[in-house]
């Protein structure tokens, strides 16, 4: 299975040290164990987790900008945890309103010594960290417009939203920021369509 992860990372054109890949794989095993009791993800097999969670998350790595990243609605840690593993020089904040999910994330961060992550249990609309983020990521949480409206107070001027979607979100993009760019994500081993909506924050 670790070879499947390595091949996928190579196909994405990414450079991730083998020790980090091993930690990512161990994180999936940890998630699988917790999932038996807490139902954190509908995907239960490691093989599918590699594709649907790890590689899917890592597919947006080339688009990541800045040093302060906020992952909204992190759930079981995607895309935030894989990105934090891959970018130890950046600081990630993972926010989710559900206690069982943030409890898992706190345990995972401690167990795997992911020192560049901060876990927050709170609704993102109420979150006031006292500073702006450079990039806000989000996967499977609301429409593009909803995500932008809920997090607008957290993104610095000139920063970016990276919103992960399945099929091309044509309807969602109507009436949103004209600077939106949609990238096709080719996730190794994943047959389903994946897209990334990149929107620059033009507020002055």
Curated annotation (Swiss-Prot):
Q: What InterPro entries does the record point to?
A: rRNA_ssu_MeTfrase_G, SAM-dependent_MTases_sf
Annotated compartments: Cytoplasm
Mind telling me which Gene3D superfamilies this protein's record contains? Vaccinia Virus protein VP39
Q: EC number(s) in its UniProt entry?
A: 2.1.1.170
What are the record keywords, sorted?
Answer: Cytoplasm, Methyltransferase, rRNA processing, S-adenosyl-L-methionine, Transferase
Report the catalytic activity: guanosine(527) in 16S rRNA + S-adenosyl-L-methionine = N(7)-methylguanosine(527) in 16S rRNA + S-adenosyl-L-homocysteine
Instruction: List cellular component terms (GO).
Output: cytosol
Q: Which HAMAP family match?
A: 16SrRNA_methyltr_G (MF_00074)
Q: Which NCBIfam families match?
A: rsmG_gidB (TIGR00138)
Name used for this protein in its record: Ribosomal RNA small subunit methyltransferase G
């Amino acid at each position: 299975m670790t070879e499947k992860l390595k091949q996928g990372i190579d196909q994405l054109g990414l450079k991730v040290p083998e020790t980090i890949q091993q930690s990512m794989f161990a994180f999936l095993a940890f998630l699988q164990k917790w999932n038996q009791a807490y139902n954190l993800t509908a995907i239960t097999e490691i093989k599918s987790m590699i594709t649907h969670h790890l590689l899917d998350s890592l597919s947006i790595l080339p688009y990541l900008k800045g040093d302060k990243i906020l992952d909204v609605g992190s759930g079981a840690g995607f895309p935030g945890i894989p990105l934090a593993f891959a970018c130890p020089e950046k600081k990630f904040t993972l926010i989710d309103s559900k206690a069982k999910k943030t409890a898992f994330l706190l345990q995972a961060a401690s167990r795997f010594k992911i020192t560049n992550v901060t876990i927050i249990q709170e609704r993102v609309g109420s979150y006031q960290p006292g500073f702006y983020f450079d990039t806000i990521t989000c996967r499977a949480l609301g429409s593009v417009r909803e995500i932008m409206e809920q997090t607008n107070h957290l993104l610095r001027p000139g920063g970016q939203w990276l919103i992960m979607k399945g099929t091309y979100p044509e309807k969602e993009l109507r009436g949103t920021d004209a600077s939106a760019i949609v990238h096709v994500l080719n996730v190794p081993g994943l047959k389903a369509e994946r897209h990334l909506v990149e929107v620059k924050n033009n507020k002055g």
